Each structure stands twice: as C-alpha cells, then as structure tokens.
Amino acid sequence: MVKYILLSVLWFTGFFQQQNNAKEIVRISDERMRGKSMKGEMILKVVRPEYTRELDLYSWAKGTEFSLVEVLAPAKDKGTTYLKRKKEVWDWVPTLERTIKLPPSMMSQSWMGTDFTNDDLVKEISIVDDYDQTMLGEDKTGDRMCYKIQLIPKANTAVVWSKVVMWIDKKDYLQLKTESYDDDGKVANILTCSDIKMMGGKLLPTTMEIVPTDKPGHKTIIIYKSREFDIPISDDFFSTQNMKNPKQ
C-alpha cells in the first residue's frame, strides 16, 4: 500500500512540475517575442486567389493596451492610421479628413482586408495568465526541435478559440508555429514564423504567415524590415490627436 501511495505522489509531483514547466516556457517565450514596448517597419501582404495586395507599414506598441499603425505605401493609402487604445480602435482616413471610432458591430470585420479581425487587435488576453498550459511533448518544426504545448482558456476568459497549440523552439524559446482551434475542435488557422534573424538586439522570426484553413488560397504575410524594443514611449503618444501625423 505504501508503495502505491509513493508512486502516486511521485506521479503527481512529476505532473505538477511538467505543467509548471509548460507555463514557464510560454512566459519566457512571450517576454522574448514581445518586449515592454516596440516600434518598427513591416511589409504586409494580403494574398487572395484573385490578387495580392501589399502595404508598407510603421507601427508602435506598448504592452498589450496600446498600438498605432501608419500606412507608408502605396500612395493611395499613405497616411491612413489605426489606433488601438485599450479596448477601443480608431481609423484616421486622410481622404475623408476624419477620425472614425469603430463600433462594436465592426469588430468582427477584417482588419485592413487581412486574415486578422479588428477584434484581434483589441483583445488583451495573456497566453501566460489566461490559459492553462499542458506539455504535449516535443516535435520538430523545420530544422528546430520544439516544445509542443497546449493552451486551454480558463473559465470566463473571453476568447474565440477553444484551444491553442504552440510549437516553441527549445533553444531560443521562439514561437515558430501556432494552431488555433474552433469550438468543434477543428483547426481554424495556422500561424507560422520563420526567417530567424537578429533584429533590435533580439533573435526573432522576421516573417509571419497566417493561413485560414477554411479559405483555400487565402493567407496574410508580415515581413519585418526593422524592429526596436523596450524604447521609452509615453501613453499619450497613443492618442487620436497624434493619428494625423505620428511623431515619437
């Protein structure tokens, strides 16, 4: 009897440590990928069966609550800006000379014609604190061995996905692949990160590609041209007044 009790205690201890390790891996990865603040230039490609649209963007972000994105090119979209301040989103459209606050009815619509929604921008969900993490094992993505970790949203957490599975590089804790599952348990979209380089003092994937599984020929690609991390930036920078001509 004592033997079985000891075995049970050892199994539970090992299971508890494994789950703690999964959460710690996700925490380290999240900190390395995000930083406290960030700014940088990127190319956004929207790929559809009929066309490919490309935008040159500059973005600023602070934590999960503040972000500002300015369109640099093409010329017809230049000067358009998008502001996220906590749970609210605004557009500045130069041709209309108007700042437009997005109503709740528009939050589920596509952001800039991409495979992201406006709602994706305003969510402040933490993959560390708002999910329960479980280690599924190890798996290879490309030429890198990764931790394969399942994330299940905690009760009362307002998220779209029923679960998320992440592949986090064992060596550098980079998030290289993420599968998001719908309520039916099917993969809704797949996010892959590649082209790992030094940028802004961090070793990071510089290309991100999201593919919705139910829309053949659709994908959105983000290619980072430059990134700076942990820069001093005031909350006041993220204001509607600053949208017309962002300066930092």
Give, region by region, the residue ranges found by the protein language model.
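Solvent-exposed coil/turn segments that connect beta secondary-structure elements
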Residues: 45, 62-64, 72-74, 87-88, ...
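Short hydrophobic/aromatic-rich beta-strand segments that constitute the beta-sheet cores
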Residues: 40, 67-71, 89-93, 99-101, ...
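Short, surface-exposed beta-strand/loop "edge" segments at domain boundaries and coil↔beta transitions
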Residues: 50-51, 75-82, 98, 156-160, ...
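Gly/Pro-enriched, hydrophobic low-complexity segments
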Residues: 122-124, 142-240
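Sec-dependent signal peptide recognition
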Residues: 1-8
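N-terminal mature ectodomain segment of secretory-pathway/periplasmic proteins
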Residues: 20-95
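Acidic/charged, solvent-exposed loop-and-adjacent secondary-structure segments enriched in E/D, K/R, S/T
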Residues: 94-123
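Hydrophobic h-region of N-terminal signal peptides that target proteins for export
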Residues: 8-18
